[in-house]
Amino acid sequence: MRLIVVSGHSGAGKSVALRVLEDMGYYCVDNLPVNLLESFIQSVSESKQNVAVSIDVRNIPKKLKELTTTLQKLKSSIDLSILFLDADKATLLKRYSETRRVHPLSLSDECHTLDQAIDLEKKMLKPLKEIADILLNSSNQSLHDLSEDVRYRIEGKERNKLIMVFESFGFKFGLPTDADYVFDVRFLPNPHWEPALRPMTGLDAPIKTFLESHDEVLELKRQIQTFIEHWLPLLEKNNRSYLTVAIGCTGGKHRSVYLTQQIGEYFAAMGHTVKIRHTTLEKRNKE
C-alpha cells in the first residue's frame, strides 16, 4: 500500500489533486482529522489499494510539529509521500474573489480580512511545506494543467524514475517556487530590441537563428547541459522523483524559451522522461 498525504493552501488545488488520485485508483479520504491518521492507516495497512488523505488547515493540531513528527515516523514504516499544493498570494486572492468562497481561517479571531487569513495559513503550513516530497505551485495553471501535473508527478514517483521538468519564466513576473535549479540568462543578447523579432517567441525559427549567431548563447547552453549531465547520476541515486530546472530572462518570451526548449529536447533525445513548460507563454495564451 502507498499513502499520499495531500495538503496545501486553501484555493491552491487540493480538491483537484484528490480527484486526480481517485481517478488513478486511490482510495481517497477528504479532510481526515489528524488525530485519526495513525489509527486510519492501521485499519487500511493490509489493503492492496493505494490511499490518499487530504489534510485541511482547520484540522491540523495547534502545534504543527506534532503532525510533522507523526508523518516522519510513518515514513519509516510505510511508503508515504506528502503532496503540497502552493500558490502565490495574488493568485489566491483572485481565486477567492472570483468564487466568492469564504477562506477557512477568515472567521478565526486572528483574521478579519482574506489577506490576513492567507498570510496566517502560509505561516501555519510552512513546516509541512518544508518536508513535502512533491511541491506543486498552481499559480499559473488551469485546472487541466494542474491535473496533468499531479498525474505526471505521481506516476513518475510510482515508476521510481526521475522526471526532468524544464520551465522558462520571466523575472519580471517573479521566481518560480518549485525549481531545484534556476539559471539567469538576462545577460545574453536580447531579440526584444530587434523590431522584426519582438513579436516572436523563442520557439520561432528567426529567434533561434538570431540567438545561435552569438557564441555566448551556444556556450551557455553547452555549460548548462554539461552541469546537469554531471550531477544527474547522483540526483537519480538519491531517489528523487523529479528535477525542476528553471531558466529565466526578463520577460520569459525569447531567450529563456529558446534555451529551455533546446535543453529539454536534448535530454529527451537521450532517453530521459522530460516535460517542458513555458510559464509566461502559457499565461499569455490564457489571457
From Swiss-Prot:
Pfam families: PapZ_C, RapZ-like_N
SUPFAM superfamilies: P-loop containing nucleoside triphosphate hydrolases
UniProt keyword GTP-binding, yes or no: yes
Alphabetized UniProt keyword annotations: ATP-binding, GTP-binding, Nucleotide-binding
Molecular functions per Gene Ontology: ATP binding; GTP binding
Residues annotated to bind ATP: 8-15
InterPro entries: P-loop_NTPase, RapZ-like, RapZ-like_N, RapZ_C
Highest taxon above the source species: Bacteria
Binding site for GTP: 56-59
Described purpose of this protein according to its UniProt entry: Displays ATPase and GTPase activities.
Family statement drawn from the similarity comment of this UniProt entry: Belongs to the RapZ-like family.
Name assigned to this protein: Nucleotide-binding protein VV0445
